[in-house]
């Protein structure tokens, strides 16, 4: 969003609807192609990824230790949940488009479906499975699919539902790629730290990784409740003021 919304806002202000749709098609096609490859590699290489980020479990799996079963279960669950990356990528893009057009309620409500599908999976699917833990992985997959499908009728309403096409060299895509570099660095620092902690926790007692996850959720709670909500609304407004070349109004909005 940090890279995409400002560029789209600029196109929306300076260009006609056709240029905006061409930008969206190029972004969707380019991003979709990359994410599809990453998703396929993640599904096919789930065992390698689990070994990489769960060294302790992998070590026990190699030597017949007590955590060997955890490695196999984690690998299977990662294989089921990894397509969520594909779904959430396009869900986030659709949400950014809707936010740019002032349709904040749709993207704000969308995450509710992930919670509902996970609860439904735990309630109805888990009793049917030999390994009930798999039900939550299925819930994540279905939650991603439902979120993905939910927003697209609203894109059609604003005539921004486009057919993706490859556009690596499209000027808008080039600009987004340039803006993404610092944004990715800022976002990745905390995630890399969490992955390293997960690697180390895999050598500890059962539940250590869960403790880390719960503490991270607790840390993210105020951020998601206030900071994300404010930034979701204010980013399109700031992007419009930047596109209007109105630094005074931009500054007043930031001061607020």
Where are these regions (language model features)?
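Membrane-embedded alpha-helical bundles of multi-pass transporters/translocases
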Residues: 1-256
């Amino acid at each position: 969003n940090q890279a995409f919304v400002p560029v789209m806002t600029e196109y929306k202000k300076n260009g006609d609807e056709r240029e905006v749709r061409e930008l969206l098609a190029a972004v969707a096609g380019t991003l979709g192609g990359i994410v599809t490859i990453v998703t396929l590699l993640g599904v096919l290489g789930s065992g390698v990824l689990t070994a990489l980020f769960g060294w302790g479990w992998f070590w026990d799996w190699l030597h017949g230790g007590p955590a060997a079963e955890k490695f196999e279960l984690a690998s299977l669950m990662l294989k089921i949940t990894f397509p969520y990356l594909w779904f959430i990528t396009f869900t986030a893009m659709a949400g950014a488009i809707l936010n740019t057009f002032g349709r904040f309620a749709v993207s704000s409500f969308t995450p509710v479906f992930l919670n509902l599908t996970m609860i439904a999976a735990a309630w109805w699917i888990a009793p049917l499975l030999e390994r009930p833990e798999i039900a939550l992985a299925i819930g994540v997959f279905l939650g991603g699919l439902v979120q993905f499908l939910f927003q697209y009728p609203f894109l059609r309403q604003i005539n921004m539902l486009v057919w993706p096409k490859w556009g690596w060299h499209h000027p808008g895509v080039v600009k987004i790629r340039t803006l993404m570099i610092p944004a990715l660095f800022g976002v990745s620092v905390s995630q890399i730290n969490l992955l390293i902690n997960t690697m180390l926790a895999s050598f500890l007692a059962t539940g250590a990784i869960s403790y880390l996850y719960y503490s991270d959720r607790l840390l993210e709670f105020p951020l998601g409740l206030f900071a994300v909500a404010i930034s979701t609304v204010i980013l399109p407004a700031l992007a419009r003021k930047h596109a209007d070349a109105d630094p005074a109004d931009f500054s007043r909005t930031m001061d607020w």
